[in-house]
């Protein structure tokens, strides 16, 4: 399960799909991953509590973590499938590499069965459908580690409004009862 104490430990012990691009990047990026792996693992207190999913509101990942469950639900609805959540597993041959996808289609009746799902809930850029290099590397590593052939790159953008009035002023929406 993602964002648990075990998940943080497993990720710290490996080069994971989400940070592998740093190994191929600039000297600064390479130094950053070396530093990340040399310092002690940081496990948020909330991750140690079994029933308290952790979302750090002080990071850019907050927006993505906050809306990931909604993105999964919408994906399941749109594609009439079921997505399962899995933890970080090591590569079967190279144990220093690991990956934890956002989900895998687990409905054996679905044409998407066995396909991974990588979600990016963006906030400050346009949805293009073309993954940034670091996302492409991430998905390639995920497929390699999990020995799967396909992954859906799923970008969503959820806009927050301070008031109901702001919501209605942002288009010609109709209220449902």
Spans of model-derived segments:
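Nucleic-acid nuclease catalytic cores
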Residues: 61, 77-101, 105-177
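Charged, glycine-rich intrinsically disordered N-terminal tails and low-complexity linkers that flank
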Residues: 1-70, 160-162, 175-176
């Amino acid at each position: 399960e993602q964002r648990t104490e075990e998940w943080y430990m497993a990720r710290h012990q490996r080069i994971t799909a989400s940070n592998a691009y740093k190994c191929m990047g600039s000297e600064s990026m390479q130094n950053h991953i070396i530093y990340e792996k040399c310092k002690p693992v940081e496990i948020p207190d909330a991750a140690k509590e079994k029933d308290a999913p952790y979302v750090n509101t002080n990071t850019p990942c907050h927006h993505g973590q906050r809306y990931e469950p909604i993105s999964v639900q919408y994906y399941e609805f749109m594609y009439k499938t079921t997505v399962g959540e899995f933890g970080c597993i090591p590569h079967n041959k190279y144990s220093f590499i690991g990956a934890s996808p956002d989900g895998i289609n687990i409905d054996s009746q679905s044409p998407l069965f066995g396909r991974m799902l990588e979600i990016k809930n963006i906030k400050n850029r346009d949805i293009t459908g073309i993954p940034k290099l670091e996302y492409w590397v991430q998905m390639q590593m995920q497929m390699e580690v999990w020995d799967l052939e396909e992954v859906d790159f799923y970008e969503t953008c959820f806009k927050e409004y301070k008031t109901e009035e702001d919501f209605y002023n942002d288009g010609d929406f109709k209220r449902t009862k």
